[in-house]
A protein has these predicted regions:
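Internal catalytic-core helix/loop-beta-alpha segment
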Residues: 65-113
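Residue-level signal for well-ordered alpha-helical scaffold segments within enzymatic catalytic domains
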Residues: 40-44, 97, 101, 120
């Protein structure tokens, strides 16, 4: 099963991954692999300190204090290791339920597989076109951290809010 979505009544932008990696499942939270660039990148984009790998509450805070939401496209699937290419038997998450609880205006997919799954299964339900962003996964090592920050920052600039919590 996937993790619960992280959102609040102030979440305007939804960031979607594909499915938790084995390291993320060990940590019981999103982007738990120590080489995944997601949390350092989000800290840089929001002006927050980089959270400790084990500090789930700090990670949730980065998302919630800045008008964002975080989830995965899949509720369940069959996968070998962390290889998105091996995903089969997909069951998409119930995005309709989330959209009744948060005023999501924009969807951003972390990588091509999340984008492909969103477009096929979730876009028909949400009606919100997604923006495909480069994956923060260590498997996408060709994309430098500076490039990730630049591309993600440009995409999210109208949605990252200043913390009021």
């Amino acid at each position: 099963m996937s993790f619960a979505p992280v959102y609040s009544e102030n979440s305007r932008a939804l960031i979607l991954g594909t499915w938790p990696s084995p390291k993320s499942r060990e940590m019981a939270f999103y982007y738990g692999h120590p080489q995944n660039r997601f949390w350092p990148m989000m800290a840089a984009l929001t002006g927050e300190p980089v959270p400790a790998r084990e500090d789930i509450e700090a990670k949730k805070g980065i998302i919630l204090r800045h008008g964002l939401a975080l989830w995965d496209t899949l509720e369940s699937c069959t996968i070998t290791g962390a290889s998105d290419a091996s995903i089969r038997d997909v069951v998409p998450n119930n995005i309709a339920s989330l959209l009744t609880k948060a005023p999501i205006e924009a969807v951003f997919c972390n990588g091509a597989t999340a984008y492909r799954i969103y477009t096929k299964y979730l876009l028909p339900v949400s009606g919100i076109p997604a923006v495909k962003l480069p994956s923060t996964s260590p498997a996408n090592a060709a994309c430098r951290p500076e490039t990730l920050r630049e591309v993600w920052g440009e995409a999210l600039k109208d949605y990252i809010t200043v913390s009021n919590l």
